[in-house]
């Protein structure tokens, strides 16, 4: 693993314009619903924040003051990722280690869990952001397989609150910033970030993935992402980056995903075409990596006689 380079690619407006011509955009109501849901917040810092001491108090505050499906009366709604990106820059939250971003309709959590386990078994210190949690909020933010402590999370919330000023943030945007803040302070060797919803406009997408994964694409969150698989796929493909591996486990992928990867110069790797696995006898399996159209990789790499997970 090497320290990740700082990417200068932040805006895919040109590519978005291309797809406005090539593919039908999601209905206005769908985009409005998505942006409305992602922009439901309270604008100004609340006096209540001064009294936030426990994690449960913080979460109750964020759930009531920053979410709810409608904009509060403090200021105007600022659509897109500009708000959360501005707070990220004030906090200097540029990851200093490789970042893996995982999107998709199904299988995101499983992929994150497998990646985290593999890296940790290889001796790397991991930071993993997932959602939703099952029992406790802390499960969303794990360092080396262990949920972050209440005190660690509340300290991060306080830093975010101090940095945001009058910039409004949603519950999930707080969650995303806190995770990366905690991983940086823990000096993680790799960050694994699961997208919450979609990809292109999700808070996780303010961080450039050194590798981006789309597990699968199907109709989900149609009110937010669109009514066709192609529309959903375009939103999820928004996590791809120029010159970086873009892995898709669905082959053939939706055309909008394929074309977006080509348009921005991402290195698209498809299951079955560029990598795959086969079952062997005696509870073993093999992994094959044979990129056909990759600009980053050449030749084949095989791993044979791998044991089945216990």
Positions of PLM-derived features:
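Conserved lysine of the Walker
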Residues: 108
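Short functional linear segments
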Residues: 47, 51-104, 117-122
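Hydrophobic positions on the alpha1 helix immediately C-terminal to the Walker A/P-loop
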Residues: 111-114
């Amino acid at each position: 693993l090497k320290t990740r380079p700082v990417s200068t690619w932040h805006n895919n407006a040109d590519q978005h314009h291309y797809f406005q011509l090539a593919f039908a955009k999601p209905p206005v109501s769908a985009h409005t619903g998505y942006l409305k849901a992602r922009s439901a917040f309270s604008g100004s810092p609340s006096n209540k924040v001064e009294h936030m001491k426990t994690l449960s108090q913080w979460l109750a505050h964020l759930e009531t003051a920053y979410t709810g499906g409608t904009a509060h009366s403090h200021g105007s709604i600022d659509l897109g990722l500009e708000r959360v990106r501005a707070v990220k820059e004030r906090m200097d939250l540029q990851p200093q280690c490789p970042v893996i971003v995982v999107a998709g309709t199904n299988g995101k959590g499983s992929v994150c869990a497998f990646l985290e386990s593999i890296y940790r078994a290889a001796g790397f210190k991991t930071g993993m952001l997932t959602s939703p949690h099952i029992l406790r909020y802390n499960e969303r933010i794990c360092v080396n397989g262990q949920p972050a402590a209440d005190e660690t999370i509340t300290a991060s919330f306080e830093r975010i609150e101090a940095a945001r000023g009058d910039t409004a943030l949603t519950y999930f945007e707080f969650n995303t910033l806190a995770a990366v803040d905690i991983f940086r302070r823990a000096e993680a060797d790799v960050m694994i970030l699961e997208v919450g919803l979609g990809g292109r406009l999700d808070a996780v997408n303010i961080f450039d993935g050194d590798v981006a994964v789309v597990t699968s694409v199907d109709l989900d969150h149609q009110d937010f992402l669109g009514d066709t698989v192609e529309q959903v796929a375009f939103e999820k493909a928004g996590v791809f980056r120029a010159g970086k591996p873009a892995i898709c486990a669905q082959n053939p992928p939706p055309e909008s995903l394929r074309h977006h990867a080509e348009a921005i110069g991402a290195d698209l790797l498809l299951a079955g075409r560029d990598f795959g696995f086969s079952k062997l006898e005696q509870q073993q399996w093999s992994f094959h990596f044979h990129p056909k159209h990759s600009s980053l990789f050449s030749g084949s790499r095989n791993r044979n006689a791998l044991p089945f997970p216990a």
